[in-house]
């Protein structure tokens, strides 16, 4: 990111993202704004449990999640649609409030999923067909491409800067 120019640095207010944002800010000199809309999806009763514990205690919830119903609200948590709407509300606010600004966001895999679906116009019920990588770099640009103003994914989950130090691949 040393060579990337941006105007604003916004991070999820959760610890892992704030720590990553602090490393970026140290190199770039930016101050860090936080926004809770960049938080990962709230998994309610499933938070902090292993997959074995979820299968044992909440198999009904797991079945509902596996059905990919975007409106299913996890007990004590939120639905995929609620999470998506929260993420995209911030993107739309940034776009209208800071036109032309280059914004660096430090977030979580589920937020990347929301952005990918938004840009690619993928329905929320469709299972993921892509991987998100921790500590990776994604570049999404809004501009005129082939005569149409739209969002374009320029770089997706680039982790070349992690070569040689190990990587943690995951789905969210």
Task: List PLM regions with ranges.
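Glycine-rich phosphate-binding loop signature in dinucleotide/nucleotide-binding domains
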Residues: 1-5, 94-101
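Phosphate-coordination/substrate-recognition cap region in phosphate-metabolizing enzymes
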Residues: 1-63
């Amino acid at each position: 990111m040393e060579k990337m120019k941006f105007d604003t640095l916004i991070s999820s207010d959760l610890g892992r993202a704030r720590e990553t944002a602090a490393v970026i800010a140290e190199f770039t000199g930016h101050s860090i704004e936080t926004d809770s809309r960049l938080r990962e999806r709230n998994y309610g009763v499933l938070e902090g449990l292993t997959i074995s514990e979820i299968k044992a205690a909440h198999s009904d919830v797991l079945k509902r999640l596996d059905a990919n119903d975007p409106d299913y609200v996890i007990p004590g948590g939120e639905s995929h649609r609620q999470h998506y709407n929260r993420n995209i509300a911030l993107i739309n606010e940034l776009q209208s409030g800071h036109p032309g600004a280059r914004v660096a966001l430090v977030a979580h895999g589920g937020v990347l999923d929301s952005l990918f679906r938004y840009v690619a116009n993928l329905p929320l019920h469709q299972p993921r067909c892509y991987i998100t990588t921790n500590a990776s770099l994604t570049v999404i640009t809004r501009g005129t491409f082939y005569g149409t103003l739209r969002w374009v994914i320029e770089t997706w989950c680039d982790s070349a800067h992690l070569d040689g130090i190990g990587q943690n691949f995951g789905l969210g």
